[in-house]
Amino acid sequence: MSHSLRTLWVAIVLLALTACASTKKGPEPPPPKIEAPAAENLLHDKTVIPGVRVGPVFLDMPLRKMIEVFGEPVSGTNSRMPGGRPALLYRYPDPGAADGAILVLVREHDQTVYSIQVERIETFRTREGVRFGSSEALVRASFGKPQSVGETTVTGQDGATAVMRMYCYLNGLAVRLDTNGNVEALTAFPGGDLRKICKAQ
């Protein structure tokens, strides 16, 4: 092989190696991390998400974390979960609603949140806009026919009786209606416990 042919061949090989080296990509950068919303971001949130949370308080949240995020409740009483197990009921008043309160039911055996009820507070609402004072029509238009309905007969001071209803949905939302058919309370609960929360239809 002649010297010039050998030089040409070496130049071609070097050129090919250089081309390969320049097209070789370095390691891919890691994908950006998607973080859960920080507790501070949810602190002033007033969204009721069925089966998940009410504002900054989540179902299954440890009691200690709930206090860190939401503060100390004004009262606590012994209670029972729908299945009969011991629980503690904690009450948080709402400064903007004199009769309003947030009631958090905590399992006694593991100190985690079982359900969260918003009573008579207009500022808490579902993504669909259902809130205290909303009509039964809006509830049904937003969530459809309830999977379960509970009824309670109440007697007024004048002796007249009226029926209050509670609509329960598999997504983990219970809606208590007053005697006029308007929303009185919203409760986020584990959807699988629907039949324990409301009497089956």
Language model regions located:
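Bacterial N-terminal signal peptides that target proteins for export
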Residues: M1-W9
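C-terminal motif of bacterial Sec signal peptides marking the signal peptidase cleavage site
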Residues: T18-A19
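Short, conserved catalytic or interaction motifs in soluble domains
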Residues: S22
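N-terminal low-complexity, Pro/Thr/Ser-rich intrinsically disordered segments
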Residues: G26-F58, R64, Q201
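A cross-family detector of function-defining hotspots
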Residues: A39, R53, M61-H109, R131-Q201
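Second-shell loop/turn segments in exported
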Residues: P50-V57, E122-V130
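Mid-length scaffold segments of soluble, non-membrane domains
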Residues: V104, T112-E119, T126-G129
